[in-house]
Design a protein with these regions (language model features):
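Carbohydrate-active catalytic/glycan-binding domains of CAZyme proteins
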Residues: 1-418, 423-427
């Protein structure tokens, strides 16, 4: 991509936007003008309002200070929690729709405004999504893909639930607005409660061209620059390609341009084998409490491999990073074919026996095991950001400090797995 640097600058301390939050851009064919609606955030009340900037070329932007949309307090919405405007054109209704994350009586809602001219907005009496769980839903994003409509959003989470990017889908926009939520349960038509990644990917927004649609979000830094540290409210941009399955559900895969960028081949150098490991020409077969360590990674790495589990068998295996012989703690990504999960854990591993002490997951996400027992794995790393793709279906983003320029390994903790065709590349 090409960076055009800062597009819309923050305002002064006495204006509505000394800090700027996310929004969306829409093109008005009639006026040949781009409209970006964004969140203005400040310390004094009302803390958040919706603001506007316009452009003729989508590069040079001018703030329209005549536009200011505040929370509809007359309808009971909180004046301080009103953000993340998403605007799209509804060709059927011949109007623009704006979705905004809002709060009412302590519960989160995605509310809706409509307009025919992008300047005057009317509040719809019913929310776009009536959030029965009360969670605060941020960054709403609605789009049509093929014959389905989708809403992608970021659930801020609660004390007992993580913050994640999720989605709903339906065959029409009206059905999407009235998505059936029964007995407090997530719609059964959406597997794994609509999780699109793990808890280290947030604030996902989408955009597409004539061929593909992509999902961008950020992978947070962690306090103390420790893999186990508390997530910070900042991070690195991560992009996924959205894959629409035949039944309308969504999967994630690597964008082709990112995959192609890692074009410089790197020689795979084995350093150590521990435990029950059988080596053939292009594969390793590992059993419980075994691992194979390889030489230090670069700053930017692509790792591809195929993992096969014997028929009528179940296994737990994965990749280990910061896998140093003089350091007991390893950052392991567990592919739990046996338990239907992907997990990141920092665990202690015995260098002589391969035995390890279990620990709680730093991040995790549910998956459906491969029906044919075969896992095609692609890993992309840049400095401390690590994204794992499984079978072109699941994405698992994490922050792993000290990953770069340190050894890595493949391992098995339960059952048996054969890992073949391991390839490394960089850019």
């Amino acid at each position: 991509y090409i960076s055009f640097r800062e597009a819309i600058p923050c305002g002064t301390a006495v204006e509505d936007d000394p800090a700027i939050g996310t929004g969306s851009t829409v093109y008005d064919e009639a006026t040949k003008t781009y409209y970006t609606f964004y969140t203005g955030h400040k310390a004094t009340e009302p803390r958040e309002v919706i603001l506007l900037a316009t452009s003729k070329d989508c590069k040079t932007w001018t703030k329209d200070r005549s536009f200011r949309l505040s929370a509809p307090i007359e309808a009971g919405y909180d004046k301080n929690e009103f953000r993340d405007p998403y605007v799209f054109y509804d060709a059927t209704a011949q109007c623009y729709r704006m979705l905004v994350s809002a709060l009412k009586n302590g519960d989160g809602y995605i509310i809706e405004f409509t307009s025919t001219n992008l300047h005057d907005w009317d509040l719809k009496p019913e929310p776009f999504f009536n959030n029965i769980w009360g969670r605060f839903y941020e960054c709403p994003d609605v789009f049509q893909m093929g014959s389905y409509w989708y809403m992608v959003y970021s659930s801020q989470g609660t004390k007992n639930e993580p913050a994640v990017v999720q989605y709903f889908y339906a065959q029409t926009l009206e059905e999407l607005k009235g998505i059936a939520v029964e007995n407090g349960q997530f719609p059964t038509s959406v597997p794994h409660e609509g999780w699109l990644d793990g808890v280290s990917f947030y604030a996902g927004k989408t955009a597409g061209d004539d061929t593909n649609r992509y999902l961008w979000g950020w992978c947070p830094t962690r306090e103390g620059q420790k893999t186990t540290g508390t997530k910070s409210w900042a991070g690195a941009l991560v992009a996924h390609r959205l894959i629409q399955n035949g039944d309308g559900t969504l999967s994630l895969d690597v964008p082709q341009a990112i995959s192609a960028k890692y074009s410089q081949s790197v020689t795979l150098t084995e350093k150590t084998k521990v435990g029950d490991v059988t080596v053939s020409t292009s594969s390793y077969t590992l059993k419980a409490n075994s691992f194979v360590r390889f030489a230090r990674l670069r700053n930017r790495n692509k790792i591809t491999m195929t993992a096969t589990i014997p028929e009528e068998n179940e296994a737990v295996f994965g990749l280990s990073f910061v896998d140093c012989s003089d350091k007991a703690e390893k950052a392991r990504i567990f592919i739990e074919d046996k338990y239907n999960f992907l997990k990141l854990k920092e665990v202690e591993v015995n260098e002589k026996t391969g035995e390890w002490n279990d620990a709680g997951a730093i991040t995790e996400r549910a998956i459906t095991p491969a029906a044919d027992n075969v896992y095609h794995i692609e890993v992309y790393t840049e400095e401390s950001v690590c994204v794992v793709y499984i079978n072109g279906r699941y994405a698992f983003t994490n922050r792993i400090y000290d990953l770069a320029k340190n050894p890595w390994a493949i391992f098995c903790t339960e059952g048996e797995v054969t890992v073949s065709d391991i390839k490394l590349s960089t850019y």
